[in-house]
Amino acid sequence: MSEDKLKALRKQIDEIDEKLVPLFCKRMDTSLSVALYKKENGMPIFDAEREKAILDSLSESAGKYKGYASVLYGTLMDLSRALQHDVIDSAGAVPAEETVRFDASLPCHVACFGREGAYAHIAACSIFKAAEIEFFPTFADTADALLRDDRFDYAVMPVENSTAGSVLEVYDLLINNPLYIVAGIEIPVIHCLLGVSGAAESSVKTVYSHKQALSQCSEFIKAHGMQQVEELSTAAAAFRVSQEDDVHVGAIASKLAASQYGLEVIKEGIQNTSNNSTRFVALSRKLSSSDDADKISIVFSLDHRPGTLYRTLARFAALGLNLTKIESRPKHAGKFEYMFYLDFTGNIDREETWRLLSALKNEMQDFKVLGNYRDRGVNIN
């Protein structure tokens, strides 16, 4: 193909686009008129059966481009629906009665996963400045304390590690219980080999730690031929070593755990990668908001049809919302059905953002705002 031929074809596409843009604008204007009619007559925005019938008909008429047409018109319908929500859901930002204001400086009672000296303990102390902290051995116990005991205002647990991935059990607790994220913090993970006085790298034959910490230090463990034993947390491992008082056992934990349980740091920084950090979240029984909140976490499910996820994500793009994480998780109730976890930058006090979330909630069977919170960077203190 000659360069002149390519230029001619591109010019033809440009001419087609020039015709499409006015038609797109006209379609959106008409959609606005439909929204006003629906608002005046108390009609719902979303009519799933009608949209499916129209989409199927338009796709079939596209012949060999059926699949492409389905994505195109599906996206157009989603954008039109979003525009209609702007008209009908005109109440503005999130209603005040649906959220509480979060203030980490106030005295509070916190349920924390693990033991004194664990990374979760470091996270809790970094988030809350005047907290009474109580520790629990499992994620379920920590969540249960917050849910069932009114003495607790918050709970702190890990949700993601930069090398080991998401802590799926915590995400499951979030979706299956009335729990909401109110703060997030990223803590650098500097794993140390801890032991009693007199212990050395050469003397330690068995190492205790949480399963994720063992995974993150797998190269060091393998190189030294150590046996691995899982504990509920890194701090629990340190406590066990302090109780056994044996130079042949060691724990993988933090320097704080060493000082907490009277152990020595045999070697510092034994993790596989130096760029290792864990993201922790503070949870509450109520959805919160704050002026400096910069991240929103949601979870939802979609019909198992081609293009549904793409179309959903396109609505975030249309508002200029930056997605920072998306992950799928199998639904317990359905075979080959999935929940999607999504993080994006934003604040629900922004009117357009709240309208989008309200629209998605109305259109999806399973939808939950997990939280709107400030997500702090790596804490080096």
Question: What are these model-predicted stretches?
Answer:
Residues 1-381:
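Domain-level signature for soluble enzymes in the chorismate/prephenate branch of the shikimate pathway
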